[in-house]
Amino acid sequence: MSSTASYRIFNFARNRIAVLRGGRRLYSRAATSRNQVKWRLFSPASLAVNDSSPHGGFALRKAYRHTSTEEEDFHLQLSPEQVSDLLRAGESSHKVLDFNSGVPNSVLRFESNQLAANSPVEDRQGVASCVQTRGTMFGIFDGHGGHACAQAVSERLFYYMAVSLMSHKTLEQMEEAMENMKPLLPILQWLKHPGDSIYKDITSVHLDHLRVYWQELLDLHMETGLSTEEALMYSFQRLDSDISLEIQAPLEDEVTKNLSLQVAFSGATACMAHVDGVHLHIANAGDCRAILGVQGDNGAWSCLPLTCDHNAWNEAELSRLKREHPESEDRTLIIDDRLLGVLLPCRAFGDVQLKWSKELQRNVLERGFDTEALNIYQFTPPHYHTPPYLTAKPEVTYHRLRPQDKFLVLASDGLWDMLDNEDVVRLVVGHLSKVGHQKPALDQRPANLGHMQSLLLQRKASGLHAADQNAATHLIRHAIGSNEYGEMEPERLAAMLTLPEDVARMYRDDITVMVVFFNSESIDTYFKEG
């Protein structure tokens, strides 16, 4: 590695961080880039603040040690094999073999991977099938301010969704089992990755709140359960409400109490897909994203976005915020492209400091919590007058799958910060060609210099490394290893993988990717049968 890619990356990242003071924490946010942290918490002891900096920035002590050592410290060169080993450490792949009413599942297989920037990683992912109803759920959960909220949502949201879809009769059986202390009917069949974690200590508390939810559904007396769109809408909002209420209720168990506080005061965006035959529903709250890779009748590929990012660049989202708050706050709702100047996404689970009144926050935090040990962020943004400013209400999109819909990509914003929608589709199609699944058809558009340049770059990149077997890994490789021209740079890729922990997060986010491949023959059968 030259002297050196990682050194340049560190200096670039360090100069793009600004510091705000809030309570006993230093809250940092990117000064100019939209592709940086959402919430970021540091203990004052872990920072060396440099007030004389022309950028008003700071040097991390650990990172500063790297900048003050000799250049040979940055000459760690990974071999191509070591790079691939690091990239593939978190990958997972599953084939779907079950049948639905005699017709093969519309999902053929799915592949996922995750690359951490935070330590510990704040992203979560999940895949589960509904046992009492039909359908498979896929979810990406992007945490901020810690991993606690993303962890909780990844474990609990699918249960709320599955219960929402249950018939009145099934819910009665669930309630009867609880009343008679008998085993519950199975709700979900999880497809867990070996690295997935779970909070077993609070399962009973979560079950109690899930039971209250299904009791309320029973009171609605709906024979067939909620529609999929209603189920997604209610599940997101009900879980977020429970997260908020759980920490307000008296809890005697110290572990549960502390964890509930961490969940409520951290946050998570979520993007969830429910696939039932040809029926695809997407629910999104925040800036994760879902897109479809579509191959037209002429063989040309295109991208079909299924979500909209809920952030300051979404005019519809800005209009929603203005409708929900007084006109006097129009100029302060978004400051520096962030909600109240502190949060990039405008929808998220948790983050009660942007939902509760100041009085409620103070009352909860004064109930004997060790907020210092729990690293709870105590900061009220300026212009905080009419909460809530944040919501977990999702936007739900329905799409009827067609034989030309070949794959679905769900990913946290760490991927979309690096690659646009069209790049992602192009890379997945190229991956399919390399691993022999499918030969991509040439676009029938007239050739032009830009198109020819793109083809040349693809050919050049393909010779730099052996083909990844996992599409999600392939996307992550290109997300962090490609330059501004779309060319794969092995030196850049190695540098991005060897950055110190405290520097890596300044330059990129956690990246979690899931690619769901559809069974075109099965979908065609659904269409023929009506």
Swiss-Prot record:
Mn(2+) 2 binds at D142, D413, D509. Keywords: Hydrolase, Magnesium, Manganese, Metal-binding, Mitochondrion, Protein phosphatase, Transit peptide. Residues 107-518 form the PPM-type phosphatase domain. Mg(2+)-dependent protein phosphatase. Phosphatase activity is increased in the presence of spermine, a naturally produced polyamine. Its EC number is 3.1.3.43. InterPro entries: PP2C, PP2C_BS, PPM-type-like_dom_sf, PPM-type_phosphatase-like_dom. Its cofactor is Mg(2+). Mn(2+) 1 binds at D142, G143. This is [Pyruvate dehydrogenase [acetyl-transferring]]-phosphatase 2, mitochondrial. It comes from Rattus norvegicus (Rat). The gene is Pdp2.
